[in-house]
Amino acid sequence: MNSLYIAGVWQDGQGEVVNSLNPVTQQVLWSGRGASAAQVEQAVQAARQAFPGWALLSLDQRIAVLEAFAARLKHHADALAQCIGEETGKPLWESATEVTSMVNKIAISVQSYRERTGEKSGPLGDATAVLRHKPHGVVAVFGPYNFPGHLPNGHIVPALLAGNVVLFKPSELTPKVAELTVKCWIEAGLPAGVLNLLQGGRETGIALAANPGIDGLFFTGSSRTGNALHQQFAGRPDKILALEMGGNNPLIVDQVQDIDAAVYTIIQSAFISAGQRCTCARRLLVPEGDWGDALLARLVGVSATIEAGAFDQQPAPFMGSVISLEAARALLDAQRNLLANGALTLLEMRQPQPGAALLTPGIIDVSAVPERPDEELFGPLLQVIRYAGFDAAIAEANATRYGLAAGLLSDSEARYQQFWLHSRAGIVNWNKPLTGAASSAPFGGVGASGNHRASAYYAADYCAYPVASLEAGSLTLPATLTPGIRLS
């Protein structure tokens, strides 16, 4: 199978076998071989050769290609949504919103480029001070499986806009979405070698990250892989590295008047996308006492009515599956381990069908667990922690090595201001779901959640470097010479 796209040509991979499965039916959706180390090198060379021509195009010429890509995404929107749904397991309604986000990324990226990395000039003495930006060159993009179209797109679009050329290694769990996306770029008229598709798993990723011919790497995925990449790039300040690595995100609930609004916001924060968003709430901090008990009772009651279903099920489910049976087993194991260490079941996360990666929402009280693991449990499992006072809640929220998202549900603006001041996270929300990120704002965190390279609206920052110039149209002597220099 022609699984790779290098230098404008589709070719068979020579590396490890990659099979993409529907996570519910286990049907094989895509099968091929990943890129070998030699093919990675071939792609790097193709990108290097394509770089000068692409970088020297005018900004308007590159924008024209990007806008043509947006048009092709719209044309293939139904097919893309279908592909995202069947490969990730997310419901069609949600897959369609992902395609919309991919389309909207073009205009937002153009706006961001002009605002953050465009050209500025002004007089400085007898010269003109000019600020321009240049592309890095050949950059690798490692994409995740949870948003296999939108999140790689969030790196690829601003990278190409800035004049870079791209080596795209998608998740081995979602190769079909990547292939369809690249075909949209081809239809848009992107020149050969400017975007190269390298399917594959761990071995392909290692070969690409280690290739000395790349000038940068943009990654969205797990903390474990991100940390490995950071170590691999240690001592290489000449390479630009942008990492987005998720979080163990806290959501504090204060005593609010509208319990149902709180319950709805908690569910949206914890269980949308089957809990497979980087910003999903992992820890729910609830006040001790009768009000907190009532909130949890209502949350458990409503969550118990949520069923996970196939991506094309009608009527449409709120939740689809997690990405794979392996992921489902790992989440169930994590739940068992927490219960064995003192957690209490409020609503058990279950796998209704043993052969399908469908999980129901789980809610467990981990207040009594002596040493709670500070890990991102990437699925529909919400850990409840009861707190005695608001200061204690903020301290508990910050008790994590991560720092991506944090939220507060409260009727008190004063408490929100206190929470905002003391929260250690890149996204801090008030009375809105944690999962409500926007491409018109930066997206990133601190601590183990990233390396201070916020993406989304700020992706332009890591896709180009600034060049400051002092310019004068003619060479003239200054009115006053520097002391000690005589020209007569």
From Swiss-Prot:
Gene3D superfamilies: Aldehyde Dehydrogenase, Chain A, domain 1, Aldehyde Dehydrogenase, Chain A, domain 2. The active site is at 244, 278. GO terms for biological process: arginine catabolic process to glutamate; arginine catabolic process to succinate. Its EC number is 1.2.1.71. It is an enzyme of class 1 (oxidoreductase). InterPro entries: Ald_DH/histidinol_DH, Ald_DH_C, Ald_DH_CS_CYS, Ald_DH_CS_GLU, Ald_DH_N, Aldehyde_DH_dom, SuccinylGlu_semiald_DH_AstD. NAD(+) binds at residues 221-226. SUPFAM superfamilies: ALDH-like. Keywords: Arginine metabolism, NAD, Oxidoreductase. It catalyses: N-succinyl-L-glutamate 5-semialdehyde + NAD(+) + H2O = N-succinyl-L-glutamate + NADH + 2 H(+). One of its GO terms (molecular function) is succinylglutamate-semialdehyde dehydrogenase activity. Pathway: Amino-acid degradation; L-arginine degradation via AST pathway; L-glutamate and succinate from L-arginine: step 4/5. Belongs to the aldehyde dehydrogenase family. AstD subfamily. Catalyzes the NAD-dependent reduction of succinylglutamate semialdehyde into succinylglutamate. NCBIfam families: arg_catab_astD, PRK09457.1. This is N-succinylglutamate 5-semialdehyde dehydrogenase. It comes from Pseudomonas syringae pv. syringae (strain B728a). The lineage of its organism: Bacteria, Pseudomonadati, Pseudomonadota, Gammaproteobacteria, Pseudomonadales. The gene is astD.
